[in-house]
Amino acid sequence: VIGGEGIGCVIYPASHYGRDALVGIALFLSSLAQKGCKVSELRATFPDYCISKNRIDLTPEIDVDKVLEAVKEKYAGERINDRDGVKIDFADGWVHLRKSNTEPIIRVYSEAATMEEADALAKKVIDVVWAVVG
């Protein structure tokens, strides 16, 4: 199991449970050594995806957990993962909604084959959030 954040931090429980960018570098270099290839060769084995990063600014009185539950209900026909917020898997990409623990905001990450598709997926779900909030 490995975890990571967009700011470059990696959490690798086999090493320790803290955020550590150097662990990510060590894992990457280890992978290069095991595969015996160059960075460009390793990169070529991965598909291209675009990620859109957005946020929804709310007010403190809004119950973000209830909003996320409503989004889950709206997309009940899609594959949903709610281990860390709400991640909705669509046929052409995904959207992950994650509440902040320090601010009244929801972070919205989406991924698709093109930036336009990633932005469109994010907008579709953001519009649902605003419809729920009213």
What is each stretch, according to the model?
Residues 1-134:
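Phosphate-binding and adjacent anionic-ligand microenvironments
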